Amino acid sequence: MLKIDNIIAGYSSVPVLDGVSIHVGPGEFVAVVGPNGAGKSTLFKTISGVVTPMSGSITFEGTDLLSIPAAKRPHLGIAHVPEGRQVFPSLSVLENLEMGAFTPAGQAAWKSNIDQIYALFPVLKERSDQLAGTLSGGEQQMLAIGRGLASSPKLLMLDEPSMGLAPAIADFIFETLIEIRKQTKLTILLVEQRVAEALESADHGYVLEAGRVVLEGTNATLRADDRVRAAYLGM
């Protein structure tokens, strides 16, 4: 579904990603893990079109993604849940979700999508008229994920969804991602610093360090790798 091949990308001609290749198949849950500064968020910004790569290719369902303007990429079925949630604080919860349903697919499936979102996150239904800026951090993260789902995506990209959350709330977010995948067969690409939880949730993983993929494999393979265990799992 998503093929990233030998991407070099960065800012002001300074590369952050140095020849990164990542493939995500239909229905897969893929995690990209690594330390701060590894280039994980830059990878997502490159897929979304915020950052223009210096070289390499990205295709989505056979379409050359780099030839598509950033504003058009969500219409292909790509939803990006950004780092830091970035909800619209002066809009209500429901209005934020409506903002997510701006694609034709999202508009067509609005009723079923909103029912699914409220089933996954009942607190959003309870607070549908509340301003998003008054929600807790965990509730805002639920809203950000719900907003992504409202577009009826084929690929859901989540950038550090556990950032700044209490452990119990972060665990709930990971459990919900697994449930979303189980219910919808949605393709999920996750960037995350909580390596143990990310690899436990995903089918396949990539370890990104200093802008390069240094390891890849199934979740079981990576969790058993001595380098991953020592560097990220505290074993």
Q: Where are the language model's segments positioned?
A:
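Conserved ABC ATPase signature
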Residues: L131-L135, E139
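Conserved ABC transporter NBD signature motif
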Residues: G56-D64, L76, W110-I114
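The feature captures the beta-strand-to-loop junction immediately N-terminal to the Walker
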Residues: V33-P35
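ABC ATPase C-loop
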Residues: G148-L149
